[in-house]
Amino acid sequence: QMDMRCSASVECKQKCLKAIGSIFGKCMNKKCKC
C-alpha cells in the first residue's frame, strides 16, 4: 500500500508534479515513491 501524499521535499514534490500533477498535495502518480 503506497502513500499517495507527496513528501515535504521540494525535489520530490516537483518530481510528482512533473510526472502527472497533484491535487491538494496528493500525488496522483501511483508510481511516485515520495
Curated annotation (Swiss-Prot):
Keywords: Disulfide bond, G-protein coupled receptor impairing toxin, Secreted, Toxin
GO molecular function terms noted in the UniProt entry: ion channel inhibitor activity; toxin activity
CC annotations in GO: extracellular region
Organs and tissues of expression: Expressed by the venom gland.
InterPro entries registered for this protein in UniProt: Scorpion_toxin-like_sf, Scorpion_toxinS_K_inh
Keyword Nucleotide-binding assigned: no
Keyword Disulfide bond: yes
Subcellular location as annotated: Secreted
Disulfide bond positions: 6-27, 12-32, 16-34
UniProt-listed PROSITE patterns: SCORP_SHORT_TOXIN
Residues annotated as signal peptide: none
Domain text: Has the structural arrangement of an alpha-helix connected to antiparallel beta-sheets by disulfide bonds.
Function: Toxin that acts as an agonist on melanocortin receptors (MC1R, MC3R, MC5R, MC5R). After binding to MC1R, the peptide activates the hMC1R/Gs pathway, but after binding to MC4R, it is not able to activate or antagonize the MC4R/Gs pathway. Inhibits melanocyte stimulating hormone (MSH)-binding to human receptors (Ki=2.9 uM to MC1R, Ki=3.9 uM to MC3R, Ki=2.6 uM to MC4R, Ki=2.2 uM to MC5R). This toxin is structurally unrelated to the natural agonists.
Note: Negative results: does not show activity when tested at 100 uM on mammalian sodium channels (Nav1.1, Nav1.2, Nav1.3, Nav1.4, Nav1.5, Nav1.6, Nav1.7, and Nav1.8), potassium channels (Kv1.1, Kv1.2, Kv1.3, Kv1.4, Kv1.5, Kv1.6, Kv2.1, Kv3.1, Kv4.3, Kv7.1, Kv7.3, Kv10.1, Kv11.1(hERG), GIRK1), a calcium channel (Cav3.3), and nicotinic acetylcholine receceptors alpha1-beta-1-gamma-delta and nAChR alpha-7. The letter 'N' in the name stands for the Greek letter 'nu' that has been chosen as the activity descriptor for melanocortin receptor modulators. Since it is impossible to search for Greek letters in databases, the UniProt policy is to write all Greek letters as their full names (i.e. alpha, beta, etc.).
Official protein name in the record: NU-buthitoxin-Ptr1a
Species classification: Eukaryota, Metazoa, Ecdysozoa, Arthropoda, Chelicerata
